[in-house]
């Protein structure tokens, strides 16, 4: 027999947990389904979350789940969602019937193919500038990426350190005008191919170029390519932006009535944890009101 819920929340990051907490406090019967594979699992400390500055993302998730499960009406299950059928039958091993669905599954990062990058990711190599740049104020920093928005990201990083070199890996695009503007901030551009990153147990020490040069750097930001994890929702025909993010209105409603989204799978993509949590709370309010209609 298919178990019935008011709302099924898919994903237990800050967006999903915040949505679920606010919904269960609205006396909704809520099921949270999560694969327990957060993309920021390698990160030791997250920042900018008021009252939780410096907490690890995994600990933040643990505390959020603990708070949620203290409420009657909340159910948490470790499971991978394989399908959402019309009528909101959610399949994740078992099948669950919902009156509304909140998608908060985040995204997947694809990094430049550097053999040692993962060794330092989460310690001295990061992807979120606002989350981690403060710890490297005035330090020699690298920005590594293969996208067309490197100049914009470099300008942002230069607020924390102007000892910054942008490595395009012979792929990323920076125009002459952008390079001039970066130079005005003391930022240089290296267009050579990158072979790897170097370091030891103390952290990153340099960027290894394909021609053999090693450029000393003590920290780096990497610009990943992002993809949403939405194959399970394909049958719903949800509208997406040109970049692949779910289209939502100001309250988190998708193009399909009864389906909502919050967090990194929505435009403009990955943001700070506290922003995702706020989006989850906003969506919860919309879901609760819509279920009364």
Language-model features, listed with the residues they occupy:
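Residue-level detector of alpha-helix initiation sites
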Residues: 13-14, 109, 148-149, 266-267
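A Rossmann-like FAD-binding core segment of flavoenzymes
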Residues: 62, 68-91, 95-98, 161-245, ...
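FAD-site-proximal beta/loop scaffold in flavoenzymes
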Residues: 113, 119-135, 224-276, 282, ...
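Internal hydrophobic alpha-helix adjacent to the cofactor/substrate pocket in enzyme cavities
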Residues: 24-28, 162-168, 276-293
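Beta1-alpha1 glycine-rich phosphate/pyrophosphate-binding loop at the start
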Residues: 5-62, 139-140, 149-172
């Amino acid at each position: 027999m298919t178990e019935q819920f008011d709302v099924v929340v898919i994903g237990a990051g800050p967006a999903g947990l915040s949505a679920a907490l606010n919904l269960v406090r609205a006396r909704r019967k809520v099921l949270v389904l999560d694969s327990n594979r957060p993309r920021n699992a390698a990160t030791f400390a997250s920042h900018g979350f008021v009252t939780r500055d410096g907490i690890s993302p995994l600990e933040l998730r643990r505390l959020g789940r603990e708070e949620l499960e203290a409420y009657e009406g909340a159910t948490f299950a470790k499971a991978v969602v394989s399908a959402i059928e019309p009528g909101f039958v959610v399949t994740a091993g078992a099948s669950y019937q919902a009156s509304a669905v909140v998608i908060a599954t985040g995204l997947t990062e694809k990094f430049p193919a550097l053999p040692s990058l993962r060794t330092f990711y989460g310690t001295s190599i990061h992807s979120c500038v606002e989350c981690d740049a403060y710890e490297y104020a005035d330090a020699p920093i690298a920005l590594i990426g293969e996208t067309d928005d490197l100049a914009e990201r470099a300008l942002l990083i230069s607020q924390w350190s102007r000892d910054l070199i942008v490595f395009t890996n012979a792929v990323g695009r920076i125009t002459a005008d952008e390079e001039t503007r970066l130079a005005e901030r003391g930022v240089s551009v290296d267009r050579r191919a990158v072979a790897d990153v170097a370091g030891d147990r103390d952290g990153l020490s340099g960027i290894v170029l394909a021609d053999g040069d090693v450029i000393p750097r003590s920290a780096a930001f990497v610009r990943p390519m992002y993809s949403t994890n939405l194959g399970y929702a394909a049958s719903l025909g949800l509208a997406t932006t040109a970049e692949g993010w779910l289209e939502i209105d100001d309250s988190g409603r998708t193009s399909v009535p009864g389906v909502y989204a919050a967090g990194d799978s929505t435009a403009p993509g990955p943001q700070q944890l506290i922003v995702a949590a706020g989006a989850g709370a906003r969506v919860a309010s919309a879901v609760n009101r819509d279920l009364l209609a």
